[in-house]
């Protein structure tokens, strides 16, 4: 088995809904009977839970992805880097005495690709978040060479953030295959005009607009999205 649908989910900033949209993607895939796996490439911010086997660290985003997928992965593959401190990844890694190696993340992805029919890889923070002194998430995306889905957090300033992110994706030789408008600020004035401005300027299709949800559940978000235009999206 080798995955035929693969994508890298990035965003215009941190805390703008990458994980919710990634879980919505996974939900849609699972609903079509696809064996779908998820990788949270780098997770910064974890809580220790005591179990019979000892102390186990959990990250909310990584757990949400695992719950939405239907291919069960070892933690080491699902989250190549699970960092304890909730801060910039390179800082969290340094505090933990860890060096984030893009080659290791790619190796995990290659293994997971053989275990599933679809793989959703979620980045960390925005598209150019430092992972080390020499690499950032853009370098990771380029190394994985996956089509990119961009989550735009709808709030003041999102036009500039979205257009700069799209330019950075193109500068890495990557293909932006779709974008999602996710409402971060429910009181944002002229939100529809902002979405229209982006739709006129981005070559990739708009996959949908997600309102501010009371509970950011995968099925609830997926109801506002249409992924059928994505490359290699499985036929119903």
Curated annotation (Swiss-Prot):
<dbReference type="GO" id="GO:0005829">
    <property type="term" value="C:cytosol"/>
</dbReference>
<dbReference type="InterPro" id="IPR004472">
    <property type="entry name" value="DTB_synth_BioD"/>
</dbReference>
<feature type="active site">
    <location>
        <position position="40"/>
    </location>
</feature>
<comment type="subunit">
    <text>Homodimer.</text>
</comment>
<feature type="binding site">
    <location>
        <begin position="211"/>
        <end position="213"/>
    </location>
    <ligand>
        <name>ATP</name>
    </ligand>
</feature>
<comment type="pathway">
    <text>Cofactor biosynthesis; biotin biosynthesis; biotin from 7,8-diaminononanoate: step 1/2.</text>
</comment>
<comment type="function">
    <text>Catalyzes a mechanistically unusual reaction, the ATP-dependent insertion of CO2 between the N7 and N8 nitrogen atoms of 7,8-diaminopelargonic acid (DAPA, also called 7,8-diammoniononanoate) to form a ureido ring.</text>
</comment>
<feature type="binding site">
    <location>
        <position position="19"/>
    </location>
    <ligand>
        <name>Mg(2+)</name>
    </ligand>
</feature>
<feature type="binding site">
    <location>
        <begin position="182"/>
        <end position="183"/>
    </location>
    <ligand>
        <name>ATP</name>
    </ligand>
</feature>
<keyword id="KW-0963">Cytoplasm</keyword>
<dbReference type="Pfam" id="PF13500">
    <property type="entry name" value="AAA_26"/>
</dbReference>
<dbReference type="GO" id="GO:0000287">
    <property type="term" value="F:magnesium ion binding"/>
</dbReference>
<dbReference type="GO" id="GO:0009102">
    <property type="term" value="P:biotin biosynthetic process"/>
</dbReference>
<keyword id="KW-0479">Metal-binding</keyword>
<keyword id="KW-0093">Biotin biosynthesis</keyword>
<dbReference type="GO" id="GO:0005524">
    <property type="term" value="F:ATP binding"/>
</dbReference>
<feature type="binding site">
    <location>
        <position position="61"/>
    </location>
    <ligand>
        <name>Mg(2+)</name>
    </ligand>
</feature>
<feature type="binding site">
    <location>
        <begin position="122"/>
        <end position="125"/>
    </location>
    <ligand>
        <name>ATP</name>
    </ligand>
</feature>
<protein>
    <recommendedName>
        <fullName>ATP-dependent dethiobiotin synthetase BioD</fullName>
        <ecNumber>6.3.3.3</ecNumber>
    </recommendedName>
</protein>
<keyword id="KW-0436">Ligase</keyword>
<dbReference type="GO" id="GO:0004141">
    <property type="term" value="F:dethiobiotin synthase activity"/>
</dbReference>
<feature type="binding site">
    <location>
        <position position="61"/>
    </location>
    <ligand>
        <name>ATP</name>
    </ligand>
</feature>
<keyword id="KW-0460">Magnesium</keyword>
<keyword id="KW-0067">ATP-binding</keyword>
<keyword id="KW-0547">Nucleotide-binding</keyword>
<dbReference type="InterPro" id="IPR027417">
    <property type="entry name" value="P-loop_NTPase"/>
</dbReference>
<comment type="similarity">
    <text>Belongs to the dethiobiotin synthetase family.</text>
</comment>
<feature type="binding site">
    <location>
        <position position="122"/>
    </location>
    <ligand>
        <name>Mg(2+)</name>
    </ligand>
</feature>
């Amino acid at each position: 088995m080798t995955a035929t649908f693969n994508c890298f989910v990035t965003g215009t900033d941190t805390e703008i809904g990458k994980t919710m949209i990634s879980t919505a993607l996974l939900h849609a895939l699972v609903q079509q009977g696809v064996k779908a796996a998820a990788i949270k490439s780098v997770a910064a911010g974890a809580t220790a839970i005591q179990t019979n086997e000892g102390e186990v660290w959990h990250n909310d985003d990584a757990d949400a992805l695992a719950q939405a997928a239907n291919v069960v992965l070892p933690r080491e593959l699902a989250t190549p880097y699970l960092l304890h401190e909730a801060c910039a990844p390179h800082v969290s890694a340094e505090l933990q005495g860890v060096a984030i190696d893009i080659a290791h993340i790619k190796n995990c992805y290659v293994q997971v690709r053989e275990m599933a029919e679809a793989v959703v890889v979620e980045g960390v923070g925005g598209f150019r978040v430092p992972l080390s002194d020499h690499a950032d998430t853009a370098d990771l995306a380029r190394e994985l060479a996956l089509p990119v889905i961009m989550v735009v957090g709808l709030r003041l300033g999102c036009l500039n953030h979205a257009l700069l992110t799209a330019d950075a994706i193109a500068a890495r030789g990557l293909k932006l295959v779709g974008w999602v408008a996710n409402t971060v600020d429910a009181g944002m004035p002229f939100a529809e005009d902002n979405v229209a401005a982006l739709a006129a300027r981005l070559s990739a299709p708009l996959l949908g607009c997600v309102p501010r949800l009371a509970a950011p559940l995968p099925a609830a978000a997926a109801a506002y999205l249409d992924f059928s235009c994505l490359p290699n999206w499985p036929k119903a």
